[in-house]
């Protein structure tokens, strides 16, 4: 989402999944590069918000730590990072614990 906010392609353009360097890499690397690219264009990340959907594991005990890590990686006040965790009420592949889902949005201020 941050790369698209500055008119770039998706994350795969910067970190192709065919490149073995990125296999198992910490996600902080990707966030820091996205923030760097925004800053290079004189932009400012205003806030970010994410919804995490998982039947298991329970994510709520980790939300505050995630917020702190994301805020640190993006250079934001933790109050500017929203994370919500929910289940899928045992429906679909998420409810069967076959996967999880995440949706995120960011507000980015760019010069004209």
Mark where each language-model region is.
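Gly/Ser/Thr-rich beta-alpha loop segments that engage phosphate groups in nucleotides
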Residues: 9-14, 94-97, 101
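Short helix-capping/linker segments at secondary-structure and domain boundaries
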Residues: 5-8, 112
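Short, conserved loop-to-beta-strand elements that form functional interface hotspots
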Residues: 48-58, 62-94
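Short, small-residue-biased leader/transition segments that mark boundaries at the very start
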Residues: 1-2
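Structural signal for hydrophobic packing residues in well-ordered secondary-structure cores
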Residues: 35-42, 67-70, 74, 78, ...
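C-terminal edge-of-domain segments
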Residues: 96-112
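Helix-adjacent hinge/juxtasegments
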Residues: 7-44
